């Protein structure tokens, strides 16, 4: 595929996700190691692009690794309790200095990301005392000193800024009602802000590719329950990351995504492609199959039209779909329709037919056809069908590889046999015996 064709294909794939995210809130928790050099510039450019696409953005950065480096340079050993930093007065002052410096750098990078365009819209970045904090106190006998936790989030003020089109920038600092300043953990703060705003997505930008399974492979999608199971075998930081992600999901955040922010364009790839690039965690499973309803008809028609034009599927009018929608099941990935299949029944109670099995060209490698077939088989078994037919002009081998055997016209139910003879397609007939 040529470069222009690739661009068109990728842009078309991105459009539904852009539409889905426009006007929605995204909270990003940013590892402080990403806020320097060329990585900062590229991240700022992508953040600016998201803002101009109409996405409401709240950015929270950490300071842990900066503080650890400074402590080591000064011969001091940082102390942690349950993964939270014990923050003395020196560390707090350094965190305040870092917060001011990194905000200035990010503002400059954000301005630079749009400066090459005439009449480029500004991308305002705002901060404020949106977070009220309190001291953590003592944990397991350890005084956490100036380490704090969020007591209250001024959600109304945050929404006011987001409504105005501003990007909200939150440092890892919060102030108490007594006027003291406390250092905040980035993971917890990002999750808390996302819950307060009921954000569509919480994205953690880290230096890892996502959450790994015990065998070392990347877990691309996880339910909250699956993520918690992985946390039991993970290291301390990964365990805290998963814990914050699950807390956000349980608080009403729609999706949590964990990705390598140092990889150029990773944020855009994660948000605007079907499979993403990191680990995406949802409260429930990502791919689901459900009964179709009348509202799905335009999407089903659009999905099967190319296959009808190629002669792979028999043409089905809108009227046909309206009258037979109860036969259809649809497969959704992340809320988007990627496949459909129908189960037709006949007077002969033990016979059924899987029909109109279709998967979007953008999802041919996702195993969705297998899932739809398994769903139809389970559905057929549930209503007492013992023989499931498939009629195909050019996918007979696919069905044969999945337990279907060549059958004769005489084995079709009588009403289906009449249709078969009249439509002139001369489809291959296959049947699979279903065992209870």
From Swiss-Prot:
It is found in: Cytoplasm. InterPro entries: AceGlu_kinase-like_sf, Acyl_CoA_acyltransferase, Asp/Glu/Uridylate_kinase, GNAT_dom, NAGS_kin, NH2A_AcTrfase. Gene3D superfamilies: 3.40.630.30, Acetylglutamate kinase-like. One of its GO terms (cellular component) is cytoplasm. Keywords: Acyltransferase, Amino-acid biosynthesis, Arginine biosynthesis, Cytoplasm, Transferase. Its EC number is 2.3.1.1. GO terms for molecular function: L-glutamate N-acetyltransferase activity. Residues 287-436 form the N-acetyltransferase domain. HAMAP family: N_acetyl_glu_synth (MF_01105). Belongs to the acetyltransferase family. ArgA subfamily. In bacteria which possess the bifunctional enzyme ornithine acetyltransferase/N-acetylglutamate synthase (ArgJ), ArgA fulfills an anaplerotic role. This is Amino-acid acetyltransferase. The gene is argA.
